[in-house]
Amino acid sequence: MAELAGYVWLVVVGAFVAFGFGWGTGANDVANAFGTSVGSKTLTLRQAVIIASIFEFAGALLLGRVSTNTIASGIADITSFTREPEVYAYGMVCALGVGTIWLIITSYYGLNVSSTHTIIGGIIGFALVWDGGDAVMWAKRDPGSFPPYKGVISIVLSWFISPLLTAAVAALIFFIVRTCVLRQRNAYTLAFWTLPPFVLITVFINMFFVFTKGAKKTLSRDSNWSDSKAAWISVIVAVCAALLCICVALPLLKKMADRHFDHNGNRITPIVPRGDYNIHPEEPLSSWQKFKKAATHGVDVDIHNIVKTDDKIGDIHDAAEKFEERVEYAFSYLQVFSAICVIFAHGAGEVGYMAGPLATIWDVYQKGQLSKNVTPPVWIILICAVGLVIGLATYGYNVTQAMGVKLAKLTPTRGFAAELSTALVIMIASQYGLPTSSSQCITGAIIGVGLLEGAKGVNWNQFLKQFASWVSTLLVIGLAVAAVFSQGVYAPSKIQGKEVIMYEDRVANLTTGIYKDFNANLQSYKSNSDALLLPTLPPTTWADLNTTVTSAATKTKNLVDPKVTQTTDVDQILGSLYQSLSLLQNYTIFTLGQSTVFPGAQACIDPAVANSSTAACRSPTLLPKELMK
């Protein structure tokens, strides 16, 4: 049975908002990953959804079920939640719920934000409410990373480091491809020579990233596993992929290219036979057809139409340098392969961490504590992965259009340079502790290839909106989660109310029992006190004690009687307990000792029979007999 069975609602609500967050991530973060491929017309939205369905699931289920630290590590000090882990779980529910709404809003406006930063912003929000500014790790020294700080400062730095690094790398890669291949007279032949090396590099980067990040925790159970071993295995896999490309992929690609293009590189237009055209009246759609049309709307949107309707975007695309279409066609298959690697690595490296909030909620519910490491169950991975795919399929077109069409002109060669540079920068940065974000990296990469067309090759208005959305994510999410979390933690709670009443009743009953036992002992000393045989317990002291005990017992009983007192302060309950313990400490034979109370006699026995009695005086008890077993 779960330790916190009363909080099963957190798991239920958490599962729903986790699915919603996965949906929002699919519409925003995963759509961003496919933006270059769809924007360059290498893939259609429908094809991107199919690839995501297969390889996102494969990466998540095969290599994504890693044992992760709580997602707050490095951002917030969660030790303040250890006494009340259910509050932390509630905070995660708030973060997922608000994060879902934020991802929907930003997706609507075509703004690409980081889903990880969204959750982190939520954690910052409820941590501040719970324990103030000290609960957040703003800038903590970490000699193992560069810059040598971790915490919120690393996120701020990623806004600048991520796009700048990938812009430089993407520009360099595309510059080399453009100079050495695209602008050469024999570009088509050179393209086939360059494809195997690019396949080798692409596979190595993505496999090394998967082995060192996505699957590291699983593979590290082998005591011989290390990053150097991961590098060698990645090299072997990459070489095999390159050989497979040479032996199988290139001949097939050459055959397909020759089928679509003539020897001069012009696309062969199929001849459409002329005939009679009959116009038929359009049949009304059935209910099923209407439902199908609505369900598939997200993959049928023409994201490239904006090039015709928006003059500024149209000018950017028209001004971009055009290359031989046949060469771009050859690179399109390399970009498809790169997109598959990217989405598989995303499933292996990101889905496991995305599942962190719901996994934490489930772990708290099961164990009643905050664990250092949490391994997401399969059902949690499935919830997140299904949400990702559905989000991409139903609402990913806005961000895909923004990243793949609005920001800069993309072609298969440009898109491949952007994807490869993103994977390369993330891999290198993760090894050296540089703060990066995949969302911000791909944005910088697209800008990098666009800048090779000059400053007018980039839609700077779109980029400024992007940058503003990165900055506002932490602020907006933090404030919104803080508001929702505050409403919950400062509102009356049925579950905690029952627990408080239980504690109050038990403490009050314990205190009343002590008073009752004390009073019984006090009555047994009355005759000796009246006879002035007890120097430490004269009649006046006995009377005062009797009055005090009787009054205190009645008062304690009334504290938990709703007919008398409806609201009880904790100090009143504990004050009564402390008073009873004080009386025991100062006025019982535990403290005074038998000989001090009445030397040579049983002080609690009537003097008339004291000489003939051997019975011992009763000793006061602190706990009821049923609790002493």
Indicate where each model-derived feature is located:
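Alpha-helical transmembrane segments and immediately membrane-proximal extracytoplasmic
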Residues: 1-629
